[in-house]
Amino acid sequence: NSSFRFFNLDGTAASPPSSLSTLFGSDESGDPIAMYDSEADRYIITSMGSSGLNFAISQTNDPILDGWHVYNAISFGTDGQFPDYPKFSIWSDGYYCTTNTSGNDLYVLERDKIIDGDPTASIQGFNAPQMITSGFASAQVLDITNDDHPAAGNATLIYLQDDAWNQVSTDHLKIWTINIDWENPNNSSISTPYQLPTSSFTSVFDGGSFANLTQSSGPDIDAMQACIMNQAQFRKFPTHNSAVFNFVVDVLSGSDEQAAVRWYELRQDSDGEPWVIYQEGTYTAPAGRHAFGASMAMDVQGNIGMGYSSMNSTNPITLRYTGRYANDPSGQMTIEENLIGQSNATNPNTRYADYSQISVDPANDKTFWFVSEYFKPGRRDLVGTFQIAANYANDIGVVSVDTPVSGLLS
């Protein structure tokens, strides 16, 4: 992707397409990500530079009219490294970004100053201790879904650890805590990780290669193994905080492969408290299809919506969604899958939909918006929207009819 454009919610264009280089200049290497900071009421566009992060935030809630505060890759350098596969998250005290790099693999941008357009906004880098990888790293910091922020500090970094990898003895999750001091960076810290044991999983496809899922024609598609998929989401509730995220797993043994989505909800009693696994599940698509490239979030009622890609060796890529109500049986996506979009061609490349993303509409905190890629016939983006929660505030129904005992009601 090399350009961006704004659309109204009805799908009509609100602006012409613009090259990313009009924002960031010549040091622009792609992988753009668009986000909305609900608490600040600002829009964000990011991309990779050759050795830094490009970052633009709208000056107001209308970037078409009022423009952007722009920080190019020189402002936010990444220690001379190309910031491969960046994943951004919004937290109370910073914009956090994980990268597939050696040495420092987590960067934090100074949110308060960036919102004000302050040119002195700074960046801090961290190397997550004891993070084992398969050779490709894609951890994520929790991203705040709505405008209800926790206290500053105690940002949470999450990564899977597969016992199929060297130096990992049992399947588990690792959790790190990051605390930032913008006044004195020497006081900033990332913790040693603690582990959350999980049910067994296999995240390795084809020995770790990028060619995995067989199409009816063309190359095998990258399943995006060893990645916490975009984004790991955080939401506060009156009695607890929740985090939801997912990664792809292989649910067949031997040489046969079927991609499925391993997903989690973690909970903590209050800000800064330890996380525990509240529920985990593995979503397998019907008819033996692959399910991968998923993105999930929670609405204001605690319902989970999940968009994902699906395909097999005879059917091209489709975009679909499923979900669950907050009080449904633990570990199950109970809502029958629904179709968002159907490809009519196959993918000519192995790489596919690295940045599928689901967001919750800030207008009602209920509607899910899912964006991913499909082929019709070439590579295209498709946005789908769905809602699980009812539109009314209170679910009112008849409890009993006391009178008349018989006859017509009027």
What do the PLM-derived regions correspond to, one by one?
Residues 1-391:
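C-terminal PAP-associated
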Residues 390-410:
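Extracellular/luminal regions of secreted and cell-surface proteins that mediate adhesion/ECM remodeling
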